[in-house]
Amino acid sequence: MKRIFTLLTLLLIIAANVPAQNTHYMRVKIQLKDGDITRLAKAGIPMDAGIYNNKEGYYQAEISDQDYTKVRSLGFNTEVLVDDLSSWYASRNQGLDPEQIKQTAMRATSDYPVPIDFELGSCGGFCTIEECYAHLDHMADLYPELITVKQEISTTTTILGEPIYYVKISDNPNVAEDEPQVLYTGMHHAREPIGMQHLLYYMYYILEHYNTDPELRQLIDNTEMYFVPIINVDGYQYNITTDPNGGGMWRKNRHNNGDGSFGIDINRNYGFFWGYDDEGSSPFTYDETYRGTAPFSEPETQVMKEFCETHDFKIALNYHSHANLLLYPWGYTPEPCPDDNVFAEYSRRMTADNQYTYGAGSTTIYPTNGGSDDWMYGEQSTKNKILSYTPEVGNNNDGFWPQVSRIIPLCQENMLQSLLAAKLSGSYAELEDNTPLIIPEKQYKAYFALTRLGQTNGTYTISIEPLGDDFVSVGDPVVIDNLSVLQTANDSIPFELGDNVANGDTIRFVLAFDNGYYVTRDTVEKYYGTPVVVLYDDFPDTDKWNGNWGLYSMFPFSAPYSMADSPFGNYANNTNNSTTLIESVSLANASVAVLNFYARWRIEPGYDYVQVKISANNGSTWTPLTGKYTHPGTDNQLPGQPLYDGIVNSWVREEINISEYAGQDIKIRFTLRSDGGTIADGYFFDNLGVTMIDVTTGVQTPETYSDFFISEPRPNPAEDMTVISYNLTDYSGNTGITISDLTGKLIRVIPLKDAKGDIEINTSQLKPGMYLLSIRQGEYKSRSVKLIKR
């Protein structure tokens, strides 16, 4: 190996002396207007060589002096931020000791602590090719029962005669088992070593934790993970030779084009819609995105084609840098691919830690053709489809060669993403607790929803395990199977609470989930007591709210309307739009209080957002609330604050514990903020309520109160509407008509404002079946009447 790389180094030094290749790179801010991205792409400027700032309207790019001349000749306003990138990248590591940085990181708290054998490399903190391969050899020496020795993918070698290596991690790595396969690659582009370094970190981590982490053990035992850390071997060695301290800016491979130029962009050379247009790739040899003379003309793409066609990869992560993005097909067209919903749902979960913006490559950055993701997913005749992603690792300051102190944090922030890729290749599913925060009766049920996410079918067993002595009994486990990808099954397990449970008591149990390989356990905390509805609005009007939101009649959760930020179309750019509850809600006697509502949204992820806020001082200050569906904001939003963005097309029930505001008067506000970039349909909410447990009221099993009159529904059966007549001889507020299913699950509460009258009930959103209706006031309730929904 040493002799081979000595020869290769000599060849690269000779190539480096070709005048046309002495390229100077700079970091430039390019001001953008409508249509400018297309103009840049047509000029051969790489549109994946930097970060877009939609809010301020510029593209921060790392480009050659030749490309900078093109940009200026097109009339763009520019600002040079760094004149000599290679020197700048190397200089900012001066005085930094990689070993000291590693030791400091090992002492820091992290969900993914630094593996003992992981090392930073000698090339600006990144491993050289020899160092990378030495790590693969070291892993095989340490864990021969879990990882293969490095192997050549193919007899085909690179332009300079180098093999492309892979390793496989599994419980029987040298045996071809019938297990889901996942692919990880790094360095399609020679100046993007963070992908390689992350894969080394990830491999060391899962190997070192195999015997101590049961979930990781089961993942490795039931998955075949394939790693190709360096695809563009020649290009990377060229950068190591020209800039041994890091900062080399060569992107392409080292193909001699015969006209004084070198290199083909490997990630424009795959065969699916190769050369579709001259914006997504370039026909000109000197351009950074030169696609070559034909699809798969390059040995690197030929090798990867062979690798994919001789395996059955379910998911692939092709690591790149930089822009804090997670991209997926299509790249060549803005039309969504057939599995767009699956890609989006996976992405939402994979970016939960790093908060990368996700979306189709064509619409999230700019159309590209001949890319790895489009071919891996789109080619389905010579192989099965692969759900292929491109993580673009690093922010605008990290660039292509992050400072050595940033390498480990970048490796760590992508760990969840890489782990989920393996899990999603298998029978992975998610279990969601849907039991109301307030349990109203001692004989009740734990409600849950199971969603199959993984590419492999599985059988799932759900059970509840009581904590403490509050439970008299629990029901049998529930078994669910034969779900399709993204299909959700709703079910429940009955339980009974003991006589020792009193009003406002906390109830705790474990919701256990066995997917056939390992068991996950989540502790669930609820409260026992009679729910008192102190606010309910299903938006027949907007009388309870002020601001610029309005009613929307299409697809409400319950007719006739839902509340929307922009009921007449997409929200506008640079919007700050709120709707605020006019009257305060009193939580004076509450021990527990819950805000709940149904919501759906379509909001540009990573930039625009909605927050739900609460105020306990009549609106002087507002605090954002954390719910089941919020996540921390990115650097382009409100960093770390809970918010909603992305796409949730179906109504979901949000439930937020606001018990910390018990004893106070509160107001609620919804706020949408947008930047100057992409706009979307916005945020919708419906059936908003505030429910509490009243500490002044003892909890009893509700008794029938003979003086409450409730009529039979009319019509019955009902389709969209039915009417109930009622008469309360003793009306004292906090009274409503409850709608429950036959299991006793509370579906809806309709507040009653008068002692008697007729009330029209919208039934259009109820599923067909039988329901029980009754009047509830505190611990008392009327007889139940049956309603049949057609």
Locate predicted features.
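Metallocarboxypeptidase
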Residues: R27-I30, P163, I240-T241, N245-Q443, ...
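Residue-level detector of functionally pivotal "anchor" positions at catalytic/ligand-binding pockets or at interdomain
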Residues: Y428-P440, V532-T542, N573, T691-R714, ...
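Intrinsically disordered, low-complexity Pro/Gly/Ser/Thr-rich segments with frequent PxxP/GP/PP motifs
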Residues: V472-V501
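Extracellular glycan-recognition surfaces and repeat-rich motifs
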Residues: V534-S578, T623-V652
